[in-house]
Structure formats: structure tokens, C-alpha cells
Amino acid sequence: MALMVTRRYLLGGEYPSEEFVQASLEKYFFRQGFDIDTGSYIDLICRDKESRDVVWHIEVKGKTSQPGLDFRTCLGQLVQRMTKDNINYAIAVPRIKQYERLIEETSIL
């Protein structure tokens, strides 16, 4: 069964857009044996097809005109949704200088 990328974005699907990052993650997790859910307020939910116990909630951002604002918004969205200990939570951004700097400036707790 082929994976159908379901979310589309105004800026298109070229790197480093959000659509590119989202599609790349969907393809990766699909190939690793995960069910993909993009139908909720969480950008990407991936659930292991076999065990159903391994779950990822991922917030996705691409290159924007305001990476600082978007990165902090992404962090806030993720933290608000961290409600269960058995879920892996992640942020996915393209590997570009603006996001690398923001990641370096973020405290690790």
C-alpha cells in the first residue's frame, strides 16, 4: 500500500517548506511500519502498526518569515499537548541556520 501525503500547504512542497518536512516524516514513519494520522490538531501522529504501544506526536514547522515566533509557537503547542507519559513528543523543522540557532538557545530540562 502506498502512502498518500494528505496535508498541503500554500508554500508548496519544496525544501525547506513545512509541507516538505511533513511529507518526509510521513514517508519515514510509514516505511518503519507506522500508521499515519494527520486528521487532528496535532500535525502528525504515528502509531506502530504491530504493537500500537509506540506513538509519536510531532509538531512540524518549515521555513517562514518569522522563524522565532513560529518555533516558540511550536514549542507551546507541543508542551500543551504533553499529557501522557507513554507518548513520544517531538518537533520537526528543516535543518536551516535560523532553526539551528533557536534549538541551541532552547534549554534542555
Q: Which functions belong to the PLM regions below?
A:
Residues 6, 58-60, 89-92:
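Short beta-strands and strand-loop turn motifs
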Residues 53-54, 86:
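A general structural motif
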Residues 73-83:
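Histidine-anchored nucleotide/phosphate-binding helix
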Residues 82-109:
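Nucleic-acid nuclease catalytic cores
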